[in-house]
Amino acid sequence: MIWKYLTQCLSQFKLLFWIFIISITLGASYWVSNIEMSYEFAKILPADDPDYKVYSDFKSTFGEDGVLMVIGVKDSTFFTANKINDWFLLTQKLKSLNGIQNAVSVLTALKGHRNDSTLKIETEPFMESPVASLSEIQKLKAELLNWPIYKHKLWDPEHHVMLIGVTFDSKTLNSANRLALIDSILMPCKHYENKYHTPLHYSGMPYLRTHIMKKIRHEMMLFILISALVSIGILWLFFRNFKMVAISLLTVGIGVVWTMALMYALGYKITVLTSLLAPLIMVIGIPNCIFFINRYRKALVENQNRNKAIEVMVSSMALTLLIANVTTAIGFAVLYYTNSAILQEFGITASMGVMLTFLITLITMPLVLHYINEPFEKTKKTTEWKWITLFLNRIETFVFHKRKTIYILTICISILGFWGMNYISLNGYVIDDFPKNDIAYTDMRFFENYFAGVLPFECIIKTQDSNGIFKNNARVLYKIKRLERMMHQYPQFSEPLSLVSGIKLAHQMDRGDSKFYSLPAVEDLKDLYERNSQTETPNPWLKPYLNAQQSQTRVSFQIADIGSLKFNALLNEIKPRIDSIFPLNTYTTVLTGHSRVFLKSQSYLQQNLIESLIIEIILIALVGLLLFRSLSIIVLSKLPCLLPLLITAGIMGFADIAFKPSTILIFSIAFGISSDGTVYFLTRFRNEIKRGLKFHEAIRVSIYETGQSMVFTTIILFFGFIVFGFSSFGGTSALGILVSITLVMALLANLILLPCILISLQNRIKPIKEHITPNTIIDDEHH
């Protein structure tokens, strides 16, 4: 048989296999050292999604919308010479940094006046040099109050809040340099904080993205270390043998290196999901080692011959573990069908990594065991676990004497699961992965309190003609004025920035009084344009709000992080009102921006969970069908796999855990791993029937023979995944806790519910022997 032949090859060509493994591992290690972090925001929506396409078109026309970082301070004693001057110098310092397009505070913002000789507008900043006297401070404050455009954009005079807006260069924004640049921004800000003992607040998409990436980088290394320590501890507890612990760690370590190198070869970068790959592969790979080592030790006790024990180990376990790893890999691979880039990258790499790690285990384990000289008596002693035997005795009692109770409990748990599942929240937030006490969370709430929010939201108005924005006596501008007045009714939105804002500012500059901060009449607008058309735009906000053909314009808002449910309800309310201002037969209006794309992703995830789970169930069922050739057995065997998922969904609902990229993985991972237990049990059960055991006796033997390794595996996986529960990211933490719970439920379902189902329906399904064909029999002669 192929497995026996493989064992012989490994024994005969040990040196060649070692050269092969070591060479690839060294090359892979070099690739791993070149893996980069992803500095772009997670792409959940597929590229062909209508809203994503609109957002992409917007960025190609007007540029990135998430380039603004904001720095704020609340200080009722701000208007003193030292604080004003230091705030001014801080703004200038930030503006001078490489990678920063602009930095502006209300102190460096533009004011202007009309030159009476040229009749053109001339501009200058409020401050060009530090102030010294009280009269200068009073004059400055009075001037600032005279310019309405800056209120609630760069400062909030009623609540004594000042703000600096820092605009990033888009090239720097999406590169590794952003992390160093953020540090360069924070350094002088911290100096200001320390000098005046006043906390500054930071937010905006560049800051939030950097905050996330720093956490990812820190947690990735931390989880790898903790996962390794947990694996060492549990392996030592199980085997009490340093050599066996070292073999297992060596095997999964090579698997991790190969997997990460594969990610590099595929051109993927480290994201919030792919950062989990290394500890995940480590956790999933360890059970392969446990099954092989347990079988090797048992065969060693029986045969007292190392070579024979290795041959029995491979022949007995290889196909079973292959099928189990295939089902686990399918759980990840189905994420490819989501058409979501971040999920596809994770799914492809994880599924291939699982199979690579299995292949490495299959080759490395026999190679290393050839050099291990373990005393037989010691091996026999360490394969006996009294507490597991007691546990399995209790399982046997439940299966053969408490089936009715088991079914009643299963029905009750299922009802609770369905009930809780109805409460699963689809209400996603941009920062709901952060704990409530995280600085990024509290700072965002600060800006929402005083400036409505920091998340970009855009309203695009498209006309049908070139220069359409200014045709028909600039009718579009007056419609935008109505739009802004209408949006002012919604406190979730900040004050807008648009062409109208810039023209109102120019009108005030031209007339010299704040009462002229308004959109002028048509004739006055034409006059203002003609007098200033040959000069540079007097307002830096005009140019970014027009496309090259002057057929499109944008009205930019910031919005609070109100959650996807409220956001969608808000869109449904304001879109018809916008369309009433801009009739569809003449104009096209589009609502977009990073906030809309991100929040739409939440509903997209729900749809893809259902699709990917259905595909996963079908694929794993097909694998089982190849093994057992019985549709009835396959259908029944899926019940113990689905019950843990139902329990998990119920817990998510009752615990108010929302769908997000990390929590959606719970179901794919858990179902794939739960199916492993089903494969282990049914394979053993089928082989016992093949040996000629009676139905009940075959089930009893299967419980005891597979139970020990399944318990070992569950303990390893439980503690491996529970590590993620300590993540500061809410989704990753939920992933770790819920997968751990699901695995325990899957263990109980496979050892209790699955045997109960087989016993109850033994007379209603075809005899198992009918489903055993020569090409599906596992060589279990020595198992």
What are these regions (language model features)?
Residues A299-V326, I689-F712:
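Helix-loop junctions and hydrophobic alpha-helical segments within the transmembrane domains
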